[in-house]
Amino acid sequence: MPRNDTVRALDWQGDHLKLLDQRRLPAETVWLDCHSAADTADAIRDMVVRGAPAIGIAAAYGVVLAARAAMARRPADWPAAMAADLARLRSARPTAVNLFWALDRMQQVVDSDPADPLAALEAAAVAIHEDDLTANRRMGELGAHLIPAGAGVLTHCNTGSLATGGYGTALGVIRSAWSGKGLSAVYADETRPWLQGARLTAWELVADGIPVRLIAEGAAPLLMQRGRVDWVIVGADRVAANGDTANKIGTYALALACKAHGVKFMVVAPSSTIDLDCPGGDRIPIEERPPEELLWLGDRRVAAEGAGAWNPVFDVTPAELIDVLVTERGVVTDFGGAGVRALING
């Protein structure tokens, strides 16, 4: 399959998983080797790898590593022997539903009692990885079709190759729109506190030769007020059955600003991110990370000594603020009734 992106976040080596350490970007390109499920779970928790699809893919490979270790320790009852490793993977990040989807899919392989379990598990993990890339390219096409030539777009966080199996979700739409119709401007907000927009999205777009302008998150409404943005395009970590969408903190504020200024708001997510067992956004668990991530920037404290911090890293955008949900199976523009459910089950 031809590539239109120059970056990959995961590389399966057959006996271990290599992860591009996204905490070190863009200053350093460092790969971390994961030789066990524990290594993989720690990398997910510590945000070496991030982005819902990439987390799911990494977890799938983590199951392969868990199975290999369990078979070496207790070949007669290896499925039971890997239970602790699977629990550790499952608890690594609470909001990204792709993690649980991938682990459930790998568990189905274990439960099927294949003749060659390791080969079957590895094939399943590779399929999850490859299917994600295929889905991203399809979403790129579907989303780009909705964006007129010469439009200005703004994206939030990082939803590109670094967050997925390749190409990206929201950033995949931007890649497709740029190469197909052309865009007047591509803006990325910095995305505090981990600066995924400044560090990762800008890095990906520059590497691909797509001009990008960085803005502070608080500048987004002014950008809309001045008519420079026609679409805000974001990814998702979990989409509820009613269309409510959990994504990186700050997404909800962008959606409210879009509604105030008549700017279109697009969510781009593979079907693996849709949780039909979750009826609405109020049921989505919101991860809160250590306050130090707000109080410090790298190794330097930026907040006054004695100040505390509240650090939720996701918020929920109600479906009524979303103009379109793009998946590899099609698009949803009407979230009433069975809109999302019909797309997935149809």
Curated annotation (Swiss-Prot):
One Pfam short name: IF-2B
One term of GO molecular function: S-methyl-5-thioribose-1-phosphate isomerase activity
Record keyword Isomerase present: yes
GO terms classed as biological process: L-methionine salvage from methylthioadenosine
EC code(s) of this entry: 5.3.1.23
Reaction catalyzed: 5-(methylsulfanyl)-alpha-D-ribose 1-phosphate = 5-(methylsulfanyl)-D-ribulose 1-phosphate
Entries under InterPro entries matching the protein: IF-2B-related, IF-M1Pi, IF_2B-like_C, Initiation_fac_2B_a/b/d, M1Pi_N, NagB/RpiA_transferase-like
Matches recorded under Gene3D superfamilies: translation initiation factor eif-2b, domain 1, Translation initiation factor eif-2b, domain 2
Positions of the record's site feature: Transition state stabilizer: 157
Amino acids binding substrate: 50-52, 93, 196, 247-248
Keyword tags: Amino-acid biosynthesis, Isomerase, Methionine biosynthesis
Pathway where it operates: Amino-acid biosynthesis; L-methionine biosynthesis via salvage pathway; L-methionine from S-methyl-5-thio-alpha-D-ribose 1-phosphate: step 1/6
Role according to the record: Catalyzes the interconversion of methylthioribose-1-phosphate (MTR-1-P) into methylthioribulose-1-phosphate (MTRu-1-P).
Family: Belongs to the eIF-2B alpha/beta/delta subunits family. MtnA subfamily.
Protein's recorded name: Methylthioribose-1-phosphate isomerase
Organism: Alkalilimnicola ehrlichii (strain ATCC BAA-1101 / DSM 17681 / MLHE-1)
Organism phylogeny: Bacteria, Pseudomonadati, Pseudomonadota, Gammaproteobacteria, Chromatiales
